[in-house]
From Swiss-Prot:
Source species: Streptococcus sanguinis (strain SK36)
Main location: cytoplasm
Protein name: Elongation factor Ts
PROSITE patterns recorded: EF_TS_1, EF_TS_2
Subcellular localization, as worded in the UniProt entry: Cytoplasm
Pfam family, one: EF_TS
GO CC, any one term: cytoplasm
Length: 347
């Protein structure tokens, strides 16, 4: 029987990431053979990971890494926010972003086959992390963005890494690119332009906006306030030339009815048309970057501001931890509480 020394345990821990007791047990079971102990720990880790496979991991972090003209943003999930602050977990997220930016995989399957700094595949690294951390740790998604030498990356993380953004701009500089990414983090656009919005999506969102107006009108009626009108349009995509021309004619008719002299109409109509466009592009403002009011200059939209500095956004990616994941009611915290309650009930 080989002597299991503290030095041997330390060496195994450094190579495997296992805890002290797990490392010592593995060495005892393999008679001090480091390589066999690593394999044993890996097998046990896979078994532990398999037991946790059905758990919902909706917490975690994003990772952002820029490698020359290639940038990656990733989302890695854990079951609890507590683990998301664990140094091992943070290192795993950062290493994942780095190997993806350098490896440029086409999809998750290719990403999981990439080699991590430890020599493991990315997939094996997550199995090991699940075993050593004690929660389900999962690699969820990534986005890769490339730029030219003349373009600029804006890399930004917010709220302790729960939100990660990369943007690419043409013109401007790195500082402007970062400001655009900060805006994206705060305002949550999903696409660049109204041209990317699905027609049915716009109709559904417009219906929801009008439903909110109906609810507001019920409250207004209770206090004697006049009802607000429904929105006819929600996106610039719906504002055809005919619609815009009719809006201008309606404004002229309104000015005539008010007795405004025609010689001043040219000074009034542009402002009213701007208001018409603003009131009838609410869906664009919620979901498209260029239509949003720029948080660094609320007198302009993002599009107008960029035009004023001869810059444009080429592409962006925004990840927020847990978006789109339906967290089970019996999550990890509840599972722990239930286990403790059961244990107390047995005593």
């Amino acid at each position: 029987m080989a002597e299991i020394t503290a030095k041997l345990v330390k060496e195994l821990r450094e190579k495997s990431g296992a805890g002290v007791m797990d490392a010592k047990k593995a060495l005892v079971e393999t008679d001090g053979d480091i390589e066999k102990a690593i394999e044993l720990l890996r097998e046990k880790g896979m078994a532990k990971a398999a037991k946790k496979a059905d758990r919902v991991a909706a917490e975690g972090l994003t990772g952002v890494y820029v490698n020359g003209n290639v940038a990656a943003v990733v989302e890695v999930n854990a079951e609890t926010d507590f683990v998301a602050k664990n140094a091992q977990f943070v290192d795993l997220v950062n290493a994942t972003a780095k190997v993806i930016a350098e490896g440029k995989p086409a999809n998750n399957e290719e990403a999981l086959a990439l080699t991590m700094p430890s020599g493991e595949t990315l997939e094996a690294a997550y199995v090991s992390a699940t075993a050593t951390i004690g929660e389900k740790i999962s690699f969820r998604r990534f986005a890769l963005i490339e730029k030219t030498d003349a373009q600029h990356f804006g890399a930004y993380q917010h709220n302790g890494g729960r939100i990660g953004v990369i943007s690419v701009i043409e013109g401007g500089d790195d500082a402007l690119a970062k400001q655009i990414s900060m805006h994206i983090a705060a305002m949550k656009p999903t696409v660049l332009s109204y041209k990317e919005l699905d027609e049915q999506f716009v109709k559904d969102e417009l219906a929801q906006l009008n439903h909110v107006i109906d609810q507001d009108n019920e409250s207004r009626a209770m206090v004697g306030k006049p009802a607000l009108p429904h929105l006819k349009y929600g996106s610039k995509a719906q504002l055809t030339d005919a619609v815009v021309a009719q809006a201008e004619e309606d404004i002229k008719a309104e000015l005539a009815a008010e007795g405004k002299p025609e010689k001043i109409w040219d000074k009034i109509i542009p402002g009213k048309m701007d208001r018409f466009m603003l009131d009838n592009t609410k869906v664009d403002q919620a979901y498209t970057l260029l239509a949003q009011v720029y948080i660094m200059d609320d007198s302009k939209t993002v599009e107008a501001y960029l035009e004023s500095v001869n810059a444009s956004v080429v592409e962006f990616a925004r990840f927020e931890v847990g978006e789109g994941i339906e967290k089970a009611a019996n999550d990890f915290e509840n599972e722990v509480a239930a286990t403790m309650a059961a244990a107390l009930g047995q005593n």
